[in-house]
Amino acid sequence: MFSFGDYKEILRLIQETGLQADYKEALTRDKFIIMRHDVEYSVERAYALSKVERSMDFTSTYFFQWTNNSYNILSRRNMDMIKDMHERGQHIGLHFALNGMTDMQQIRKRIKMEMEILSEMFGFEITE
């Protein structure tokens, strides 16, 4: 069973490698480790995980869905947690759900629209 203690050990091992990078940093490296989280079920759980990371001076990217049956990204509580994560240095991105879409032009348009909406709602730019 997953525990925060186990996760801290994973983070410690990654830190020892010196390979931790965000998406922009990875573009300039031959070797890197990117930590990312696709948030499928719980903003609250992602928030707790981000606190563990911050306690170890670790940064990763959290991808949230605009349309999700498990959470409402725009509830006041969820927005406050996500804004706090961003303010504490975590990267926030869009976890796009195709929901049956197949037209690439429409998909690109929808991704851009969702990123713009989230940027407006959160008050910071969503670029990932």
Tell where the protein language model's regions lie, with residue ranges.
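Catalytic alpha-helical scaffold of carbohydrate-active enzymes acting on polysaccharides/glycoconjugates
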Residues: M1-E128
